[in-house]
Design a protein with these regions (language model features):
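ER/Golgi luminal nucleotide-sugar-dependent glycosyltransferases, focusing on the catalytic module
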Residues: 1-263
């Protein structure tokens, strides 16, 4: 079921929108896909199972195809949650977050969790220093479990809003709650001992930001302006460090360009 996430203040695309009913659509610039997650939690009552995907990312079976309804039913009879494969990072999660985002935001998240859910802290303090996470907030599970997760997650962020000011951040770094939630889903599932089925993620095309960056770099290369290309991509990475991630640079062209520029 297509859902226009972040619909508030945007053009009507003819889809079901997340600015109806009980919603936080106006917070999309801070919450990313979580405004859709919130909408499903509060307003969708028509199915025993629910799933969250993106406009270009989908959970797929071992054959690389979308799961059939029968496959999902079979998996959920044996597992609590279907989600992405665990991502192994170059650095511990805490260090990587501090490098790409504002460290104090993660510190505040941990502070709030310690106050609201102190029983999570032993596990959280271990996991935050491991080199593992989940990504994308992509999942399938029973609606009852989904509701339980949302009831745990959103109070954390609503309290964080009272303690941090993200209005001075650029558009990428404002999406702080969307970023942190990817890791918190992993923590929540671990603490609650969920039986998790991890699967591949199918992707349709590259991010618009990745395409734009490649096009700009090609113009520099055509002019043989390597220094200009280096300055451009380094400045772009300050605003969008995600463009070099495998989920963004699908064919590895940007990483190759970085090697050319920096050698």
């Amino acid at each position: 079921m297509p859902l226009h996430v972040g619909r508030e203040g945007k053009e009507d695309l003819g889809y079901l929108s997340d600015n109806t009913g009980d919603n936080i659509s106006h917070k999309n610039s801070y919450y990313s896909e979580l405004t859709g997650v919130y909408w499903v939690w509060k307003n969708f009552k028509d199915s025993e199972n629910v799933g969250i995907c993106h406009y270009r990312r989908f959970l797929v079976n071992d054959a690389g195809r979308l799961f059939t309804e029968a496959e999902i039913e079979s998996l959920l009879s044996r597992y609590d949650l279907i989600t992405t494969k665990t991502l192994t990072m170059r650095y511990p999660y805490y260090d990587g977050f501090a490098h790409n985002h504002n460290q104090k935001d993660l510190d505040v998240a941990m502070e709030v969790i310690g106050e609201l859910y102190p029983e999570y802290m032993d596990t959280l303090n271990v996991m935050v220093h491991k080199r593992e996470t989940w990504f994308g907030n992509i999942m399938i599970c029973k609606k009852t479990l989904f509701d339980t997760y949302c009831s745990w997650l959103f109070p954390i962020f609503f309290e964080m809003e009272k303690r941090i000011d993200v209005d001075a951040y650029d558009d990428y770094h404002k999406r702080i709650y969307g970023f942190i939630s990817e890791f918190l889903l992993y923590v929540w599932a671990t603490v609650n001992g969920l039986k998790v089925y991890q699967c591949k993620v199918g992707m349709l095309g590259e991010k618009a930001e990745t395409k734009e960056l490649k096009l700009a770099l090609s113009e520099f290369f055509i002019k043989k302006d390597i220094l200009g290309a280096k300055q451009y991509i380094l400045e772009a990475l300050k605003k969008r460090p995600d463009v070099l991630m495998e989920a963004s640079d699908l064919d590895g062209e940007l990483k190759l360009a970085m090697q050319v520029i920096t050698t």
